[in-house]
């Protein structure tokens, strides 16, 4: 939707990848912004008429402390004031590998849980969904990296 102002934040500070994937160079340092050391406007880059990206080019050694820190709510408020986005999307690290998301989840309106097919069990998805629901609203679950398509899928199944 072209009219929707969106801010995409690469909150996987341990293994940031969005700036690199999108071919954006420069001194992006979302960790410094979330620590209160840098203004959000100096961190973010517009990559379209209604899309801004904030990321880290290099891993942050203190990622756990950043998300549990006192500046996080202030930094998120600054994002809202600076860009007035309709939607903010936070790409976070895998929930089962770090506690970053649980420290962060209470500061967002909702989450969309993304699970890797053949990597994440139903039991793990259920556990993550229940834990997230204690902090915020869970919109749903997306199954990612799915390679198998069953016989009953597609238009041929209607014949």
Residue spans for each PLM region:
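Conserved Switch II/interswitch segment of TRAFAC-class P-loop GTPases
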Residues: 86, 94-97, 108-126
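Hydrophobic micro-sites
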Residues: 126-159
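Short alpha-helix adjacent to the SAM-binding motif of class I
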Residues: 20, 78, 123-131
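Switch/connector loops and helix/strand junctions flanking conserved nucleotide-binding motifs
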Residues: 16-18, 62-64, 122-123, 148-153
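Short glycine-/polar-rich loops that comprise or flank the Walker A/P-loop
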Residues: 2-4, 108-110, 135-139
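P-loop/Walker-type NTP enzyme "switch/lid" segment
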Residues: 4-84, 94-98, 102-106
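Residue-level marker for beta-strand->alpha-helix junctions and adjacent short loops that shape enzyme
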Residues: 13-14, 95, 118, 146-148
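Conserved beta-strand segments of the P-loop GTPase G domain that flank and frequently precede/overlap
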Residues: 9, 55-56, 86-92, 113-117, ...
């Amino acid at each position: 939707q072209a009219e929707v102002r969106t801010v995409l934040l690469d909150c996987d500070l341990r293994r940031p990848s969005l700036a690199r994937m999108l071919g954006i160079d420069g001194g992006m340092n979302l960790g410094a912004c979330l620590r209160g050391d840098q203004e959000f406007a100096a961190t973010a880059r517009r990559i379209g008429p209604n899309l801004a990206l904030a990321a880290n080019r290099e891993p942050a050694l203190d990622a756990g402390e950043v998300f549990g820190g006192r500046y996080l709510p202030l930094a998120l408020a600054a994002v809202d004031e600076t860009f007035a986005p309709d939607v903010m999307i936070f790409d976070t690290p895998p929930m089962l590998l770090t506690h970053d998301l649980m420290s962060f989840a209470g500061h967002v309106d909702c989450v969309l849980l993304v699970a890797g097919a053949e990597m994440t069990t139903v039991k793990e998805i259920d556990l993550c969904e229940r834990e997230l629901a204690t902090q915020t609203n869970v919109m749903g679950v997306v199954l990612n990296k799915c390679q198998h398509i069953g016989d009953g899928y597609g238009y041929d199944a209607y014949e």
